[in-house]
Amino acid sequence: MGPAPAGEQLRGATGEPEVMEPALEGTGKEGKKASSRKRTLAEPPAKGLLQPVKLSRAELYKEPTNEELNRLRETEILFHSSLLRLQVEELLKEVRLSEKKKDRIDAFLREVNQRVVRVPSVPETELTDQAWLPAGVRVPLHQVPYAVKGCFRFLPPAQVTVVGSYLLGTCIRPDINVDVALTMPREILQDKDGLNQRYFRKRALYLAHLAHHLAQDPLFGSVCFSYTNGCHLKPSLLLRPRGKDERLVTVRLHPCPPPDFFRPCRLLPTKNNVRSAWYRGQSPAGDGSPEPPTPRYNTWVLQDTVLESHLQLLSTILSSAQGLKDGVALLKVWLRQRELDKGQGGFTGFLVSMLVVFLVSTRKIHTTMSGYQVLRSVLQFLATTDLTVNGISLCLSSDPSLPALADFHQAFSVVFLDSSGHLNLCADVTASTYHQVQHEARLSMMLLDSRADDGFHLLLMTPKPMIRAFDHVLHLRPLSRLQAACHRLKLWPELQDNGGDYVSAALGPLTTLLEQGLGARLNLLAHSRPPVPEWDISQDPPKHKDSGTLTLGLLLRPEGLTSVLELGPEADQPEAAKFRQFWGSRSELRRFQDGAIREAVVWEAASMSQKRLIPHQVVTHLLALHADIPETCVHYVGGPLDALIQGLKETSSTGEEALVAAVRCYDDLSRLLWGLEGLPLTVSAVQGAHPVLRYTEVFPPTPVRPAFSFYETLRERSSLLPRLDKPCPAYVEPMTVVCHLEGSGQWPQDAEAVQRVRAAFQLRLAELLTQQHGLQCRATATHTDVLKDGFVFRIRVAYQREPQILKEVQSPEGMISLRDTAASLRLERDTRQLPLLTSALHGLQQQHPAFSGVARLAKRWVRAQLLGEGFADESLDLVAAALFLHPEPFTPPSSPQVGFLRFLFLVSTFDWKNNPLFVNLNNELTVEEQVEIRSGFLAARAQLPVMVIVTPQDRKNSVWTQDGPSAQILQQLVVLAAEALPMLEKQLMDPRGPGDIRTVFRPPLDIYDVLIRLSPRHIPRHRQAVDSPAASFCRGLLSQPGPSSLMPVLGYDPPQLYLTQLREAFGDLALFFYDQHGGEVIGVLWKPTSFQPQPFKASSTKGRMVMSRGGELVMVPNVEAILEDFAVLGEGLVQTVEARSERWTV
């Protein structure tokens, strides 16, 4: 595939986007006004095709210079293509700081330094005596318990040092943060400050005093507090310049102790530095018991002692190797696009920088490598190395006094030691986050190894927000409920270690609990904790419950997702007690067919949509049982969109069962056709050619049982007819089946004669099905309708050579040549290509059970926007199929919800002008063939449709988009998808609930010039509307199943018939838009040329009136008469015709 760079965003930690240059006009821009939407539909497409560069012969054959030869050699060695090199260089140019901005930042840093060292000192007081603090500033730390020993005085910092990525040249836009370490004078600190948060209290008081004085300085436009990497014990002070440079940079001040002040041996992961008697007012478990270790607390102290040494290490390795710096910058972009560096416990840019240093030290990366090679090497390492099992270390020392890796593994989920051997750099990274990093690295390596043309774009330019990357998400709120979870899970040591942060304390145990419970249903569980927002220095720091929402993402495994049974051990095994303890009251003894008696859990789920939501039952049950988190605190987002494709009667089903029943009935009919006796030629193939038979019909049919009293009966044809005094009967669409007959010399060679023979076969087919199987049939010259088990099938007899016969053209000299005609192309599409497509998509559904739901939601949305008739049904099915066959950079969707979001993203960002959409069914197209097809596409672009979809069976012509959409309709769809996607994602990620999920399905009616409102009485699919009516009309169907001997009314849809008449009569003046699924409104847009005066012609006065302008007779639309004709044509169906005259003038 080849998505356009349009609408893509590189998001920083604060979520502010830096929009890359758009390539497709009008894409991804929110807040489009109605007038712009109207222009989109009405105006011709903008010129935007990529044109080949033409060179003169001399330029084409000019010898390369030495510089060009060197560059080519470098490209061959360091990159796998020159295109990739250009893309990498352009991206780095985009995210790097310019020299001008660096100079302005340097100047600001010098000003900050001068002001910090001039802050006045404060005399010594007790730590608990904070009366000296001015009224306008609050201590940025929760002082619980408040009582703590020690004294504090303020002295200006002994040293001010810039640390972090700014000096290294690896920081990336748009959010430039410069970290500054303030070394506190030794006189402020005391020997036992490592105990009971004393150091952290002093650190916070130091910042509070600084904040008070710096806030009064006119240099700063903003002075506020923030948490360092989300750690609530380690606030930092943020400074931003005043005026035009306000967004240029954020300087973060980090107080730290003097070098070697804290002894590392006291801060080992096995040591305790928060006494239970101080923190809880009691010893841990009675007299004489050991204090629990506080590894995370110890790590947070240690982190402040190594800021400068880490900078020196990074500088030594990176400073002389531009390729390493480029690699770090690319890795930071990679993390940012996947939101892996956000919030507490994120996999930060600092960690990947240190990982590069580790790989250099172990000779897995060489300093001469390019940024792309560094990126590949790091991703390869992450994909194949599990730091939760085998930690790594930068420490080269063999000192026996150093702690062992095993000690760190016992204390932390992920282990990566720094060069001192005392500090775990990944102390804050949870196992879930690291496994997510591993998962993303594996996907990225597969993408890079495929060498796809758009691999760079998918890897580094495509955002992967949680709601679009995971099948289901769940929000836990309020966070204060996690306090109860800590009590239930007995997490007192963890609370003590985390300084009371019950969210961090409970996070690991909760994710482990859910991973165990979801088992084979789960591929990956990830969590997202949004960064705690900054706060004003005059405010108290945010409480733990105010730190946003804890959101968990579930990447599901389709193989085990829909199983209703959790099978436990046999009753007499010792593991049975553990199983019962884990599942609680849901576990029960069951006897199975093999005679075994086992513990088991059975979940309640009747329909496929309910089975997809079994993880919801698992999550809520386990959280309530083990963590005391009630269901009311768990907002699970897995199926809110299911309501849009739910059947009319089975409100709990999204139609999969009805589709399976229809396909099963089709299979039975196929067997009957294969076994028919008495046909002059045998059946060679029976193929489905209808959306139902590829599982993509939005509202699948159900068996029809007509109430005969509701209809008129046509006895001689055993058929029913609608009655004028009754509401419109239920809509019944026959399912097309193509029946191929064997070739024979008896077939005529004349096209008209072939059609007559086919008509005879249609009649004979009906006779034999009625005689041999008692089926109700109705034959015509082109098809035979068959009623079987309440379903209606339309069988079309096909002869394989007929398309070729239709292509034959005879010259006056008697020479026969083959030439495509409209009739031959249509017949080939309907009898060969459509059955092949239906068969391929049927197979895709067997492979990916979510395909049906995704395709149906996609079509439901397109039709709800009143644009359905601009797109062939098959074209939308293929776009949905592309999400499963080419899911990069994601995995194939396992839920309709995430698939629909990706559909909106694909539609709104794909570069339809310059790329064909590849849908490689059955993986038949090789990479070389795709390159060849792309070249042919660019060469013939002007002759191809605006939307080109390539499949293995349709490599050049894009059969399914030949008749639409137009450029204007496609652009309107792109605009609507770009507006709907962020709105829907915001709704689904709202922890209070998604609100009205149907909002994005409601069409924007304000863009239309005329609205024709229809009577629900004559809308047969009224109940399928986006806003389903509370009550509708009886449609003449019996609720109880039973045999039917009469053919129901087929394909009778008055709004569609009315639309056909409108287009025939007024298609030259206006465009008509309608939602076939129960829409009550037809939108009318006048064409731009409609109101231009036309020369008077007696032959074209329809809908126009004659006027005199400039002495000449001209014709202009007679709007009043046209609107009256709208109502007359639709008499009985049309309720009102609303002319929105403010939108147009004659």
Curated annotation (Swiss-Prot):
GO terms for biological process: ribosomal small subunit biogenesis; rRNA processing; tRNA export from nucleus. Residues 1-48 are annotated as: Disordered. Its main location: nucleus. The keyword Methyltransferase does not apply. GO terms for molecular function: RNA binding. It holds the Pfam family Nrap_D3. Gene3D superfamilies: 1.10.1410.10, 3.30.70.3030. One of its GO terms (cellular component) is condensed nuclear chromosome. Keywords: Chromosome, Coiled coil, Nucleus, Phosphoprotein, RNA-binding. The modification Phosphoserine is found at S56, S283, S289, S811. Residues 83-114 form a coiled coil. InterPro entries: NOL6/Upt22, Nrap_D1, Nrap_D2, Nrap_D3, Nrap_D4, Nrap_D5, Nrap_D6. It is found in: Nucleus, Nucleolus; Chromosome. Part of the small subunit (SSU) processome, first precursor of the small eukaryotic ribosomal subunit. During the assembly of the SSU processome in the nucleolus, many ribosome biogenesis factors, an RNA chaperone and ribosomal proteins associate with the nascent pre-rRNA and work in concert to generate RNA folding, modifications, rearrangements and cleavage as well as targeted degradation of pre-ribosomal RNA by the RNA exosome. Belongs to the NRAP family. Part of the small subunit (SSU) processome, composed of more than 70 proteins and the RNA chaperone small nucleolar RNA (snoRNA) U3. Interacts with RRP7A; required for NOL6 localization to nucleolus. This is Nucleolar protein 6. The gene is NOL6.
